[in-house]
Every structure is written in structure tokens, then in C-alpha cells.
């Protein structure tokens, strides 16, 4: 697997929340190969065989779902890290897809960007085959096991992780809902897929939930 970047800035903003669509467990390694980041994920992932170990290894901040106090504590930790110049990466769909569509973004994950007066950096992620077309080979979706996913990836001759850096969005003056909607629209346009409907009016697909539920 190789990586290709488009429109990448020479340097990301000092306080930067990196926002991506989510396709696979491989995504975190694709990002870390470019810029080491702290990832945000639901606490259950920590106990997933091997995947949890990998996520912890690269640096992941886990959030316990269903516990408002834990969510507030995690949010404060994210704000502190953003203020200290750490790069924070989130997958606000909260699940994986094959990248042929986009799920609604959880607005709650954008609150730390507001509190830290950070910049939101949308990135559209795709996996391409040797001919430059879309491939599902990297997808970790539905009932696919981790071993099945690994085997599909290593047995696919050529996969390119395509990272398209879109226009940054200053959090100042925005709301978490407006940030979610703007990043949804930007990433959907870059992927050439329809922008998702409201998270309150659309059922989620069969992907793997990757983060805490939000609005």
C-alpha cells in the first residue's frame, strides 16, 4: 500500500482538528505516516483483539459512551492537547463505510475545536486500485473480521490511500453543528457523493462504529 496526498499544506495549523471519513482500521496508520496524531475512539475498541492494541500503540484517546462525565473529561483532555499544539484526528461518522457514501457527522466531536479556538482540517480519504479507480479492498465494514480484512489488503496487488486536504475551517464564530455540516459538505463534494442527511433522520449503514455517539 502506498499513500498519495493532494492539496496538502506545508504545515498544518498549530491547533488543528483533523476530520476524515472512515473506511478501515488502516486509516490511522495512513494518517500517522504523514503526521503523528492522537485519535479519538469509543472505549470498546480498546478491547478489540489486536485492533485495540494497534489503536493504543499509535496513541488513541478513548471515550466511554453513555457517561456524560467521562465525555466531558475526554473533551477537556482534547482541548488541552489542542491548546498544546497536538494534532487531533477524528472520524465523526462514528462508523466505517466503503467510501462510496458518507454518514452524518456527530456534531459533539467538534466541540473541542470550538473550546480551543482551533482550525478544522477536512480530509477526504479514498482507497484506489492500480488503475486509479475506487477499491473496496481496504474496507473494514460490517461482519468482516480483522483477519479477513488483513488478508484482503495483503492479497490485493496495488492499493493507494488517497488523502485530499480540503480548505481549512476556522472554528471561531461557528457552532459545532455548523462545523459538522460544513465538513460533511466539503468531504462529500471531494468524494463526489451526496452530502448526508441529518443524523436524526437517517439510519446508519452496516459499518463498524468507531467513535462515541453525538448529536
Could you tell me what each predicted segment is?
Residues 71, 76-88, 92-110, 114:
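Soluble extracytoplasmic domains of inner/organellar membrane proteins
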Residues 15-17, 60, 85-91, 119, ...:
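Residue-level preference for the first positions of well-ordered beta-strands
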Residues 1-5, 53-58, 156:
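A transmembrane-helix-recognition feature enriched in membrane-embedded lipid enzymes
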Residues 14-68:
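Catalytic core of membrane glycerolipid acyltransferases/transacylases, capturing the structured
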Residues 2-3, 39, 62, 88, ...:
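Hydrophobic beta-strand scaffold residues
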Residues 42, 63, 91, 123-126:
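Generic beta-sheet signal
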Residues 50-53, 67, 98-178, 182, ...:
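A cross-family acyltransferase "interaction/gating" segment
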Residues 1-33, 190, 198-215:
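N-terminal signal-anchor transmembrane helix
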Amino acid at each position: 500500500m502506498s499513500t498519495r496526498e493532494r492539496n496538502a499544506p506545508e504545515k498544518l495549523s498549530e491547533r488543528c482538528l483533523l476530520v476524515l471519513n472512515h473506511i478501515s482500521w488502516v486509516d490511522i496508520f495512513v494518517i500517522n505516516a504523514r503526521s503523528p496524531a492522537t485519535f479519538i475512539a469509543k472505549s470498546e475498541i480498546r478491547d478489540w483483539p489486536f485492533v485495540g492494541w494497534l489503536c493504543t500503540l499509535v496513541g488513541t484517546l478513548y471515550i466511554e459512551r453513555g457517561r456524560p462525565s467521562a465525555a466531558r473529561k475526554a473533551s477537556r483532555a482534547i482541548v488541552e492537547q489542542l491548546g498544546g499544539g497536538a494534532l487531533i484526528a477524528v472520524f465523526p461518522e462514528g462508523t466505517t463505510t466503503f467510501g462510496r457514501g458518507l454518514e452524518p457527522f456527530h456534531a459533539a466531536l467538534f466541540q473541542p475545536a470550538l473550546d480551543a479556538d482551533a482550525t478544522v482540517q477536512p480530509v477526504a480519504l479514498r482507497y484506489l486500485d492500480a488503475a486509479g479507480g475506487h477499491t473496496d479492498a481496504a474496507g473494514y465494514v460490517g461482519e468482516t473480521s480483522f483477519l479477513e480484512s488483513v488478508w484482503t489488503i495483503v492479497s490485493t496487488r496495488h492499493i493507494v490511500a488517497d488523502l485530499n486536504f480540503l480548505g481549512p475551517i476556522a472554528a471561531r464564530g461557528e457552532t459545532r453543528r455548523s462545523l459538522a455540516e460544513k465538513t460533511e459538505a466539503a468531504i462529500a463534494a471531494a468524494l463526489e457523493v451526496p452530502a448526508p442527511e441529518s443524523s436524526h433522520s437517517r439510519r446508519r449503514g452496516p459499518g463498524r462504529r468507531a467513535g462515541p455517539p453525538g448529536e
